[in-house]
From Swiss-Prot:
UniProt xrefs under SMART domains: Gp_dh_N (SM00846)
GO-annotated molecular function: erythrose-4-phosphate dehydrogenase activity; NAD binding
Originating gene: epd
Protein name per UniProt: D-erythrose-4-phosphate dehydrogenase
Principal subcellular localization: cytoplasm
Organism this protein belongs to: Klebsiella pneumoniae subsp. pneumoniae (strain ATCC 700721 / MGH 78578)
Length: 342
């Protein structure tokens, strides 16, 4: 069965979801029937075809009135600001991928369902009242058919959760800190301009800018046992894509850096293949652009202090890796069916 999806919000993640779908060869499993985006149709087509981070899209893209064509596939374009008015029932939409970055509450999810969608997947963290939050590769097996409103967590949560799980399973984590070194985002300024967050009033291309993060809450949402045992900070840096995460954890069992690397490399080749990758090459952030993994461990940066303090550096393409996980989670949601009494 081919899953019929609609995308609500066609920004960085929405466009990368479409590109990832076509590049990954999963069009027999998923088809995009509609895109809802307030921008004009010509702009939608142009930004899908041409992308500063990911280059020119390999598929032919054209737009005719309110239809977007990717190759021979036709996708209906909508410009509807009200979720409840979207024609999901008419279009027989199985799963809505809400990639607005704005909506994320149960109320918003239920509005999509009332419009006729069978299930909803948010591309960002949602409230505690959602049916599930999935970090694919770690907890997708907990999905049930009755889980209709789901969050795919965040790009940084998807990056760090598999590594935390591996270290905790092997050595027993007592506590940890996380520093996210994140590329600039759309909520920052090109030149100095007003913003409620005074640090974000400053030009994104000229400063390393500390910002708030809810990553610690994201960790404890997946692993409740770490409540009050993880803290996180974040800085934005003047690059347009790829993120590095500095993870430091104290563990119960004594360990050496080489043993940590052996553990993570084995996982990348085995149970977490396709989700986690491992490298010891002398690479920099641009080398991880367009990498589909959730996390790439840089083994050259692993350190252990006093046998119990582990520091790792983990890379991710915060756009492309996350877009691929959106597709994975969509398939997982569809695989368990659309019976809602389970």
């Amino acid at each position: 069965m081919t899953i019929r999806i609609a995308i609500n919000g066609f920004g960085r993640i929405g466009r990368n979801v479409v590109r990832a779908l076509y590049e990954s060869g999963r069009r027999a499993e998923i088809t995009v029937v509609a895109i809802n985006e307030l921008a004009d149709a010509a702009g939608i087509a142009h930004l899908l075809k041409y992308d500063t981070s990911h280059g020119r899209f390999a598929w032919d893209v054209r737009q005719e009135r309110e239809q977007l064509f990717v190759g021979d596939d036709s996708i209906r374009l909508l410009h509807e600001p009200t979720i409840a008015a979207l024609p999901w029932r008419e279009l027989a939409v199985d799963v809505v991928l809400d990639c607005t970055g704005v909506y994320g509450s149960r109320e918003h999810g239920e509005a999509h369902l009332q419009a006729g969608a069978k299930k909803v997947l948010f591309s960002h963290p949602g409230g505690n009242d959602l049916d599930a939050t999935v970090v694919y590769g770690v907890n997708q097996d907990e999905l049930r058919a009755g889980h209709r409103i789901v969050s795919n967590a965040s790009c940084t949560t998807n990056c760090i959760i598999p590594i935390i799980k591996l270290l905790d399973d092997a050595y027993g984590i007592e506590s940890g800190t996380v520093t996210t070194i994140h590329s600039a985002m759309h909520d920052q300024q090109v030149i100095d301009a007003y913003h409620p967050d005074l640090r974000r009033t400053r030009a994104a291309s000229q400063s390393i800018i500390p910002v708030d993060t809810k990553l610690a809450a994201g960790i404890t949402r997946i692993f409740p046992q770490f409540n009050d045992r993880f803290e996180a900070i974040a800085v934005r840096v003047p690059t347009i894509n790829v993120t590095a995460i500095d993870l430091s954890v104290t563990v119960k069992k004594p360990v050496k850096a080489c043993e940590v690397n052996q553990l993570l490399q084995k996982a990348a080749q085995g149970a977490f293949h396709g989700i986690v990758d491992y490298t010891e090459l002398p690479l920099v952030s641009t080398d991880f652009n367009h990498d589909p993994h959730s996390a790439i461990v840089d083994g050259t940066q692993t350190r252990v202090s006093g046998a119990h303090l582990i520091k790792t550096l983990v890379w991710c393409d915060n756009e492309w890796g996350f877009a691929n996980r959106m597709l994975d989670t969509t398939l997982a949601m569809a695989a368990i069916g659309f019976r809602f009494d389970a």
